[in-house]
Amino acid sequence: MEKQYKAVFFDLGGTLRIAFLKEAYMRHARRKMAEIAGTDMPYEEFYQMIEERYEPYRKWALGEFKESGDEELWCKWLLPDYDPVRIRQVCHELSFQYRQCKGRREVVDGGVEVIKGLHERGYKLGIISNLIGENEVPDWLEEDGLDSYFDTVILSSVCHMRKPCSEIYDLACQQIGVKPEECVSVADNIKRDIAGAKKAGIGCNIIFRSPEKKHPVEFTEENRPDYVIEDFREILNILP
């Protein structure tokens, strides 16, 4: 019997990867970011400056459904008053360290089991994620030996589109040669992920209620998923 769905797209933050707030790790990242930038400011003050400058960038990104690559992010938005030659050279590492300031990211419990299980069952796998930083995800996939399981990795920082923009799903479908209705989306944000996936015509939407997101949510016809799961391994029961 032919499967109803042929591909599964995973969101990252709060879905396939969970951020754990480990203060020593985060403090090291704040210190490292200041060191890389070559600032004379105390590292905590430098971090606060970046946070303040990030707010107008975030407002633009959310409003326009766009994302800057590393060079534009740091040279235009976050450190326009620093040496552009130096910042261009270190922009990828700055993005990586800035994200580590928010926590240490680890694969969700059961995540590797689900990836390998779906791959064995013949599903094409992809990642569609809104995030800054062009290199972190490819580096992580390679280091963890997971890169061979994914047929496409769509990052907003690389394609310069953000969910809920439906075109980001269209791009993923085109890259692996499947129709939107043949795809499953696994994500955690009903407003951003469900809206974009439904607009793109994704066939099935699964919302994962990750450990740090247990607050009540209200579903409407626009954002109602097909499944809500609290254990990531439940995906293997949904997709034969």
Language-model features: where?
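Asp-based, Mg2+/Mn2+-dependent phosphohydrolase catalytic module
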Residues: 1-8, 20, 35, 41-44, ...
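N-terminal helical cap/lid subdomain that shapes the substrate entry/recognition surface
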Residues: 2-109, 113-121, 134
